[in-house]
C-alpha cells in the first residue's frame, strides 16, 4: 500500500478540502467556517490556520490544523494523525497549542502525544455533539407568541454582555482572574463584528443570549449560550437558542450543530429537536503546550 503524501495546504487545495470535510460536516464546523472566512494560506491573521493534509489518489484523506490563536484541530483517521502531527512539528518546531478541538477519539490520540501538564489545562471536556434539521425544530411557545423576543446584539450592548461572559468563563474554566473582564470585552467585540449574538428579551429586559460560533451557507453552529444564574430554569436558554436558529433558517441554513457538557442544557436542546451524533473534545491550555516530536 502506498504511503499517503503529507504536505501543507494552500488555497489551491480548497476544493479538495471542502470535499473531504463536507462528508464529516457535523464535527468540522470550525475548520470549514474559518477556511471559508480566511482561506487556507497563512499570514498570522484572524481565523487563519496552518493546514496539513494527507493525500491519497488526488483526494484528501486526513487533516490537521493549527489556528492563528493556537488551537489544534483535527479531522483524520488514527493512522494518519501521526504523520500529520510529525509534519506540523517539523515545519513549526516552536509552535504551541493553546487549545484542542477535535472528535473525541482523535483528541484522545493527540493528548497521548501532547501530554499537557495538569497545571496548564484550563478546560478539557468530552461533550455530546448534537445535530438538528431546522425544518424540524420545535419552537418554544413563548417565542412563537411574542412573550419572548430576540434581537441581534451590537457593540452598544457590551456593558451588560461582558459581565455575563465573565460569569460564563468562570463557570466554564474556574477561577476569577484580573484580566478576565478585558479579555471578555475584546472577545465579545470581535464576535459581534464577525458573527451574530442574539439577545433574548422579555418586556425589554435581556434575559439570555445565544450566538453562532461557526457558519456555512447551509449550516450554523451554536455557542455562547448563557442565562444569568438568577434567571435559570425558566426556558430562557432554550428560547435564545431557538431564536438564533430561526435567524439562521431565515438566512437559508438547513442544519444546526452544537455541543454541551451540562445535563440541563442537553435536555433543553433535545426539546428543540436536537439529536446526538457524536462526541467532541474541547480543551484550553495556559500556558500553551509545545507540539512535541513523535518518539
Task: Please identify what each model-predicted range represents.
Residues 2, 9, 19, 25, ...:
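Conserved donor-binding loop and adjoining core beta-sheet/short helix segment
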Residues 3-17, 103, 149-161:
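A short beta-loop-alpha structural element at the N-terminal edge
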Residues 36, 66-68, 177-225:
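A conserved beta-strand-loop-helix scaffold within acyl/acetyltransferase catalytic domains
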Residues 60, 67-146, 283:
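Acyl-donor-binding surface of acyltransferase catalytic domains
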Residues 79-88, 223-229, 233-250, 267, ...:
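Conserved acetyl-CoA-binding loop-helix of GNAT-fold acetyltransferases
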Residues 94-104, 248-261:
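Conserved GNAT acetyl-CoA-binding A-motif
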Residues 105-122, 238, 262-279:
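Conserved active-site alpha-helix within GNAT-family acetyltransferase domains
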Residues 122-134, 257, 275-293:
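Conserved catalytic-core motifs of GNAT/GCN5-like acyltransferases
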Amino acid at each position: 500500500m502506498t504511503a499517503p503524501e503529507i504536505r501543507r495546504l494552500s488555497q489551491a487545495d480548497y476544493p479538495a478540502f471542502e470535499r473531504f470535510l463536507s462528508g464529516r460536516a457535523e464535527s468540522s464546523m470550525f475548520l470549514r467556517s474559518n477556511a471559508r472566512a480566511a482561506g487556507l494560506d497563512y499570514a498570522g491573521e484572524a481565523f487563519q490556520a496552518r493546514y496539513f493534509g494527507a493525500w491519497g489518489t488526488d483526494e484528501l484523506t486526513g487533516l490537521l490544523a493549527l489556528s492563528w490563536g493556537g488551537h489544534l484541530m483535527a479531522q483524520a483517521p488514527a493512522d494518519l494523525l501521526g504523520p500529520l502531527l510529525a509534519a506540523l512539528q517539523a515545519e513549526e518546531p516552536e509552535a504551541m497549542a493553546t487549545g484542542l478541538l477535535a472528535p473525541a477519539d482523535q483528541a484522545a490520540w493527540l493528548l497521548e502525544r501532547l501530554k499537557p501538564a495538569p497545571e496548564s489545562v484550563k478546560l478539557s471536556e468530552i461533550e455530546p455533539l448534537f445535530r438538528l434539521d431546522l425544518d424540524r425544530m420545535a419552537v418554544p411557545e413563548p417565542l412563537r407568541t411574542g412573550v419572548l423576543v430576540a434581537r441581534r446584539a451590537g457593540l452598544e450592548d457590551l456593558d451588560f454582555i461582558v459581565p455575563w461572559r465573565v460569569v460564563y468563563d468562570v463557570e466554564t474554566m474556574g477561577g476569577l482572574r484580573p484580566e478576565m473582564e478585558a479579555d471578555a470585552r475584546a472577545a465579545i467585540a470581535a464576535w459581534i463584528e464577525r458573527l451574530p449574538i442574539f439577545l433574548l428579551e422579555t418586556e425589554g429586559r435581556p434575559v439570555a443570549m445565544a450566538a453562532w460560533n461557526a457558519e456555512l451557507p447551509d449550516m450554523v453552529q451554536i455557542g455562547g449560550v448563557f442565562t444569568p444564574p438568577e434567571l435559570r430554569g425558566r426556558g430562557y436558554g432554550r428560547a435564545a437558542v431557538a431564536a438564533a436558529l430561526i435567524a439562521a433558517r431565515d438566512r437559508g441554513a438547513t442544519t444546526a450543530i452544537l455541543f454541551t457538557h451540562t445535563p440541563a442544557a442537553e435536555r433543553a436542546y433535545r426539546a428543540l429537536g436536537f439529536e446526538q451524533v457524536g462526541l467532541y473534545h474541547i480543551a484550553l491550555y495556559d500556558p500553551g503546550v509545545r507540539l512535541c516530536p513523535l518518539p
